[in-house]
């Protein structure tokens, strides 16, 4: 665990207690060419560096979890390079992905993945430790999620971790007592058959009052027109992010394509960071 980075992250967060951070699902493979220094992640490094006051929680996911090899960094030089570069920034927490599959993944499988994420800290060639666990596809099964989170905290021991629970929708308030961050909305901007993002209406409906600093909003496919006909341009992006900041929502992320693109405009990773700074 990169303790100096944690201290820096805490300092940055305290210095801007009402700041809205970036919760980035970094589902982009780190490299375009083997061992190229994780060039595919360079836009993230640039955005993090350009906005040191913005806290980041960056979710990494080699293969629906810590990877197939069972080894730290998934025994992949490109992930080792990318994660070690993320860990060099004091305003970044690197978070490991696990899939709960709506509480149908076996607890043994979940615990195995959590343990493998912890073991990334044993790699001696670079700092690739993760600072927390991202529980994807969380659902309303308190005992299941509480057991997984309790195991995660015990596994990481004296190293404090961040637990992120991705409900993607309204979650009962009790989950805010066990999850450090609850994703209360995840959907596209205005896709047919999917929940629409409606700015303040969505925030008020999906986040229990008083829990805004522990909540996150993620909007993908920010393109075309919004629910009210507004064009998904840089101005609307700034408006939506400013509303989240004004409401003291703890975390946000918008992207104009899927999670496999961080440079498609207008909601590039750099623009999101700039608007939240």
Task: Please annotate each region the language model reported.
Residues 1-19:
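Fungal secretory targeting signals
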Residues 17-277:
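Glycan-processing catalytic domains of CAZymes
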